[in-house]
Amino acid sequence: MAIERTLSIIKPDAVAKNVIGQIYSRFEGAGLKIVASRMAHLSRADAEKFYAVHAARPFFKDLVDFMISGPVMIQVLEGEGAILKNRDLMGATDPKKAEKGTIRADFADSIDANAVHGSDAAETAAVEIAFFFPEMNVYSR
């Protein structure tokens, strides 16, 4: 499997629960390296731009409101099959349907406050990484 990079966001609900370190441990335990990270409090404009693909969906306003409700932790993960590996670690979008031991099963409260975001494909990952790390201050190690 190829070395890939993927974008991960620890959402406001998980940041508020003080579980960033526990989530990072899961990434690293699965063989993923954190090659860039920063904490941010997204502006409405940034959240709307980042989630623009969902603009026509009925949940868009609530998603944006949630994502600007508190700080988020944004990171780039790197490793073999990083995109799929991260999605497996996250679990199903709805934490009630997520397998036991996944990030969402353990830390998420609802389908809206679901603890984490992860890129769903290589093309999406490239766009999402460039959105949050435009200077490409991402370092392989």
Swiss-Prot record:
Active site as annotated: 117 (pros-phosphohistidine intermediate)
Localisation: Cytoplasm
Documented EC number(s): 2.7.4.6
Annotated ATP binding sites: 11, 59, 87, 93, 104, 114
Enzyme class: transferase
Family per record: Belongs to the NDK family.
Protein name (database record): Nucleoside diphosphate kinase
Organism: Burkholderia cenocepacia (strain HI2424)
